[in-house]
Amino acid sequence: MIRLALVEDDSVYRSRLREYIEKYSAASGEKFTVTEFSDGDEIALGYKAVYDIILMDIEMKFMDGMMAAEEIRKVDTEVIIIFITNSPQYAIKGYAVGALDYVLKPVSYYAFSQRLSRAIERVARRARHYLQINAHGTAHKLDTSSIYWVESNAHDLVYHT
């Protein structure tokens, strides 16, 4: 399941992108959980690293997409960002915040699906498996590829990484 954030201030355009996501899901069999935001500040302020892909408009009222991406990158360097914009001059700036790509409005379904496929391939390549380990009342997330061996000692497990 791909966790996707859709950040677009124009409700009509946000609906169109949502339809594209649903169409892509039906055609590819890929499942999405989509969270919609109507401005950059809604996603950036208090951002939690829970998304695989963010589709984000650049020109928005309160916080533009570039500023939102800068704030998001402070917390999450892994999330894939694809900018959707009317202005091609933002493309170079988009790469400065680690955007995977950008799409010019009006977005065709073909262009959208190509960018989304590329993003999903990147998500699949970085997919890892984690164990959640509770130690001394605190939950820890441990990447299974970092474990060398596990030792059992008097009903306790010791993970060697």
List where the protein language model places each region.
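Non-catalytic signal-transmission and effector/linker regions of two-component phosphorelay proteins
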Residues: 1-5
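Conserved sequence signature across two-component system core domains
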Residues: 7-8, 37-39, 54
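Acidic di-acidic motifs
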Residues: 8-9, 86
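Two-component/phosphorelay signaling modules centered on CheY-like receiver
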Residues: 10-35, 74
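Short, flexible loop segments at the rims of nucleotide/cofactor-binding pockets, characterized by
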Residues: 32, 58-60, 135
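Helix N-cap/capping motif at the beta->alpha junctions
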Residues: 36-42, 65
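CheY-like receiver
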Residues: 45, 51-125
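Conserved binding/recognition cores within well-folded domains
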Residues: 114-161
